[in-house]
Amino acid sequence: MPPRGLELLIAQTILQGFDAQYGRFLEITAGAQHRFEQADWHAVQQAMKSRIHLYDHHVGLVVEQLRCIMEGKATDPDFLLRVKRHYTDLLPDYPRFEIAESFFNSVYCRLYDHRSLTPDRLFIFSSQPERRFRTMPRPLAKNFFPEQGWQPLLTTLLTDLPLRLPWQDLARDVRYIIAHLNETLGPARLAQAHLEMANELFYRNKAAWLVGKLRLPDATLPFLLPVHRSDDGELFVDTCLTGSAGASIVFGFARSYFMVYAPLPAALVEWLREILPGKTTAELYMAIGCQKHAKTESYREYLHYLRHADEQFIEAPGIRGMVMLVFTLPGFDRVFKVIKDRFAPQKEMSEAHVRACYQLVKEHDRVGRMADTQEFENFVIEKRRISPELMALLQQEVGQKLTDMGDKISISHLYIERRMVPLNIWLEQATGQQLRDAIEEYGNAIRQLAAANIFPGDMLFKNFGVTRHGRVVFYDYDEICYMTEVNFRDIPPPRYPEDELSAEPWYSVAPGDVFPEEFRHWLCADPKIGPLFEEMHSDLFSASYWRALQTRIREGYVEDVYAYRRRQRFCVRWKNHNGHPEAAVSAIAPSAVGEG
């Protein structure tokens, strides 16, 4: 085959491989409605894992094909550049060009073991950056105007959903939504508003989300409705979210990816950007399940920051870890985590174990309590960007992962993660209600992780962070395990009075044994924290609490986990109004509810 024909064949093979991958991605995503209708929550969890694995699987298939057809050209740099040019020529009219570029990068990295990662060989920057703002041909959303009032508008919106289940009480849910809108906006502003709703539902866990925009003359607000399925197979709306902070949490970096049918992901990302202005492009792609392209965008955001900030990398604030070396740029919103060459003596584990823990988190339901990460190999940093103190620490702690490249160093493996304030630092500075909220959040994080079959292992405050919305998120994964793998035990009574004074336990301790009573020693040691913890979370110190959760997990029960406060649920917010919340909201205008 002539060289130019071979180069084109390779480019076409890579793009065809991506087509196959994204086709399967959409196929799994399209099954979300059926899984929701059938309440097959275990299938929901399996589909999430399968969709994540798809990408690497198809990259591997393409790499095997290319190794068979490259005819020894793999080491010819000019040949590789021509392949990329051919691939670029295939993309101008390609609907998912931006993710196809990331797929090319992944194939290249797999073929060449993450070496020679330069802009001429990879799509480190997009070949068509202007296309993401182009009007897409397929309408993503539909407008709803309250010409006859909000009651018929919302009734139409909900009854037109593709879900093939009856409503528990549609009129009640419509009243709830209208009451929330009146309470939030007031009747006068609501009368001037209309909705723009995404055509596709956003599925995650046990909810199907309607995602839309509440358009007002002077503003555009998020409009989010989580639809749930009752145990009797009936639909109900659990709440209505119209605040930017609430929407940001729903699409947060600590949550599992949505299943939303998006044949044109760039168009959906641009549409979402208006109601999620605090989210980066990487975070938006991550939220809709395009996590590998989100990694590309995350790296581009990092490069953009470097171009516009003259800062040096420093060790991240907080207590130094026993397994990870963590560093950051002072003004950047992410941290860089490198597994140390040697762990502290009490950490009896291997690097392979740590990597497996991070992969577990990637694939598991993170329930809003575990930060997502992007994994990089051969990550290059200019030496001038590294503070002398950090350089010394890198050489001391992760020297085996460093390669000297003259004016740069390469780190063979690291994770990038969203930066948070370490909880121990937050608690040192918090007072009053802020302290109380943080302790409540910490306990809720532990409970929700446990309900999702995750035991953090090391529950010290330093292993948790606080987000900009005040949520507590777990981020130290080296001791993480499934709840069902742990043996929760009560401490046996002492045999003799002197047993309690002994430095050694008077009872046997096997691998996997955990004694929740011991949590009290380090979680309640601070006198300003202890009473709050005892008040709100004392059951966490009881082995019976943990064993009861294990029983539910083993029986196959999947807990409900909400992306909003319990008090925001309609059934809690208006539980004393018998489905008629308008009694709690003053001056609901007839025009607003369509009754005048």
Swiss-Prot record:
Q: Name one GO cellular component term.
A: cytoplasm
- What Enzyme Commission number(s) apply to this enzyme? 2.7.11.5, 3.1.3.-
Signal peptide start and end residues? none
Origin organism is Cronobacter sakazakii (strain ATCC BAA-894) (Enterobacter sakazakii)
Q: What is this protein called?
A: Isocitrate dehydrogenase kinase/phosphatase
UniProt keywords (A-Z) are: ATP-binding, Cytoplasm, Glyoxylate bypass, Hydrolase, Kinase, Nucleotide-binding, Protein phosphatase, Serine/threonine-protein kinase, Transferase, Tricarboxylic acid cycle
The encoding gene: aceK
HAMAP family attached to this UniProt entry: AceK
Give one Pfam hit by family name: AceK_regulatory
Q: What does this protein do?
A: Bifunctional enzyme which can phosphorylate or dephosphorylate isocitrate dehydrogenase (IDH) on a specific serine residue. This is a regulatory mechanism which enables bacteria to bypass the Krebs cycle via the glyoxylate shunt in response to the source of carbon. When bacteria are grown on glucose, IDH is fully active and unphosphorylated, but when grown on acetate or ethanol, the activity of IDH declines drastically concomitant with its phosphorylation.
GO biological process per UniProt: glucose metabolic process; glyoxylate cycle; tricarboxylic acid cycle
Annotated catalytic residues: D372
